[in-house]
Curated annotation (Swiss-Prot):
It is found in: Plastid, Chloroplast. Keywords: 4Fe-4S, ATP-binding, Chlorophyll biosynthesis, Chloroplast, Iron, Iron-sulfur, Metal-binding, Nucleotide-binding, Oxidoreductase, Photosynthesis, Plastid. This is Light-independent protochlorophyllide reductase subunit B. It comes from the Eukaryota. Protochlorophyllide reductase is composed of three subunits; ChlL, ChlN and ChlB. Forms a heterotetramer of two ChlB and two ChlN subunits. Its EC number is 1.3.7.7. Component of the dark-operative protochlorophyllide reductase (DPOR) that uses Mg-ATP and reduced ferredoxin to reduce ring D of protochlorophyllide (Pchlide) to form chlorophyllide a (Chlide). This reaction is light-independent. The NB-protein (ChlN-ChlB) is the catalytic component of the complex. It catalyses: chlorophyllide a + oxidized 2[4Fe-4S]-[ferredoxin] + 2 ADP + 2 phosphate = protochlorophyllide a + reduced 2[4Fe-4S]-[ferredoxin] + 2 ATP + 2 H2O. It comes from Stigeoclonium helveticum (Green alga).
Length: 510
């Protein structure tokens, strides 16, 4: 446990609640003190949904500490069972309430005797895993519970569908453009002649989990959530899974070819070949392939970028920038420390350096040191970019309200390639455009600010030096200002004049 004002991945109970609230007609009971119950507010604020967040907090207060929690927890479970009539009630402690070391499984067993709903305790170690790991584990636990229940009742659907079908695993609430991605995946699969059997957990019903084995194979679009479920289904029912993220032209092609391989391995009577579909989509539907060869994109060649986010999106974005757009990635990083080995393996050869950390200050310092032309990261990197006056495109959760758009903005599939191309192009500040804006806008309206993460500055610029600085084109002015101030600090100069600017230029070898 640590105190922080920004966390990339939250505590474990947030992941569990995200999975529970993604399913339809599932209610979550959170055994927690006041202060841990911010999930309701966060989800209600960010997700564009009409329904209330189905989470009830069983508050740990002084009365509970004096008498024990059992009576209150069991009462909350049975009350919600009568009021909401859910299919499943999921009980989760938080890292704070876990300190009490109570036998919550005993509470669940007792409540289950009095409830019509299924009651389940989230099997997550709240001290050892983060939000994403807990979400992955909780999804697998719920799927396993309902499949084993169906096996006992002898009503498990294991007969495969006549036409090729698929389950999409890992779409869930508060994910990065997950609902748009799901829609785009459905369109892509439909065009390939593949029906979607189930999508879980987003919008799915726990009562339909017994139908998962009917599908021919599974798709896991994001590594962070769904992989454990796919591995479980493969082990139990020999269901293959595709875990390539179809983000960017190259990976979307690999994704479709992998699907063809899976279908050919299952159905020996038919031959599945999607080459013609790939060619048509790449040439006519996706504008990204054409855009990558245009003069606009060639202007971005060898521009420096920094990428940071969850493992799935950071890897995909790094490969898109380098392979498809010719942009140099100075540093690729992720906050998914549990997936560090896979991340390093994937970005090897695509970037100059790798940063794996969940400390936002290290990421901010790295960006300030590299001084990229653009950043592609989370909401935090957007804040860092604003302070350093470096444009930032948001490509990964955690994100704020502007990345839960009402319009259709997928990042996966061929329509996703268009969105990414727009995001990349619009994120870079184009030199001539910036210069023209300043010429016609006038320099008196544009104030030059210090480009560093620290806001205090003991340096003074003379009027002449400021005027000279304003004559420098905007797209390199920030670098000149930082180099001059760095030179001044090294030489203990307090007032920066034109002479100091030229001396700094000489020392930099420019």
């Amino acid at each position: 446990m640590k105190l922080a004002y920004w966390m990339y991945a939250g505590p474990a109970h947030i992941g569990t609640l995200r999975v529970a609230t993604s399913f339809k007609n599932v209610h979550a009971i959170m055994h927690a003190p006041l202060g841990d119950d911010y999930f309701n507010v966060m989800r209600s604020m960010l997700e564009r949904e009409r329904d209330f967040t189905p989470v009830t907090t069983s508050i740990v207060d002084r009365h509970v500490l004096a008498r024990g929690s059992q009576e209150k927890v069991v009462e909350n479970i049975t009350r919600k069972d009568k009021e909401e009539l859910p299919d499943l009630i999921l009980l989760t402690p938080t890292c704070t309430s876990s300190i009490l070391q109570e036998d919550l499984q005993n509470f669940v067993d007792r409540a289950a005797m009095e409830s019509k709903s299924d009651v389940l305790l989230a099997d997550v170690n709240h001290y050892r895993v983060n939000e994403l790991q807990a979400a992955d584990r909780t999804l697998e636990q719920i799927v396993r519970f309902y499949i084993e229940k169906a096996q006992k009742q002898n009503n498990l659907s294991t007969t495969k569908t006549i036409k090729p079908s698929v389950n999409i695993l890992g779409m869930f609430t508060l994910g990065f453009h997950n609902q748009h991605d799901c829609r785009e995946l459905k369109i892509l699969l439909n065009q390939l002649g593949i029906t979607v059997n189930e999508v879980i957990p987003e919008g799915g019903s726990v009562l339909n989990l017994k139908n998962l084995p009917k599908a021919w194979f599974n798709i896991v679009p994001y590594r962070e959530v769904g992989l454990m479920t796919a591995v479980y289904l493969e082990k139990e029912f020999q269901m293959p899974y595709v875990d390539i993220t179809p983000m960017g032209i190259v990976q979307t092609e690999s994704f479709i070819r992998q699907i063809a391989n899976v279908l050919n391995s299952i159905d020996k009577t038919n031959s599945y070949n999607f080459d013609q579909y790939i060619d048509q989509q790449t040439i006519y539907v996706s504008q990204a392939a054409w855009f990558a060869r245009s003069i606009d994109c060639q202007n971005l060649t060898n521009k420096k970028a920094v990428v940071f986010g969850d493992a799935t999106h950071a890897v995909a974005m790094t490969k898109i920038l380098v392979r498809e757009m010719g942009i140099r990635v100075a540093c690729a990083g992720t906050y998914c420390q549990h997936d560090a080995d896979w991340f390093r393996e994937q970005v090897w050869g695509f970037c100059d350096e790798v940063l794996i950390t969940d400390d936002h200050t290290q990421v901010g310092d790295m960006i300030a040191r590299i001084e990229p032309s653009a950043i592609f990261g989370t909401q935090m990197e957007r804040h860092v970019g604003k302070r350093l006056d470096i444009p930032c495109g948001v490509i990964s959760a955690p994100v704020h309200i502007q990345n839960f758009p009402l319009g259709y903005r997928p990042f996966l599939g061929y329509e996703g390639t268009n969105q990414i191309a727009d995001l990349v192009y619009n994120s870079f500040t184009l030199g001539m455009e910036d210069h023209l804006l300043e010429i016609f806008g006038g320099h008196d309206s544009k104030e030059v600010i210090t480009k560093s993460l620290s806001t205090d500055s003991e340096l003074n610029w003379t009027i002449e030096a400021t005027s000279e600085l304003n004559k420098i084109p905007g797209f390199v002015r920030g670098k000149v200002k930082r180099n001059t101030e760095k030179f001044a600090r090294q030489n203990k100069i307090i007032t920066i004049s034109i002479d100091v600017m030229y001396a700094a230029k000489e020392s930099a070898g420019a």
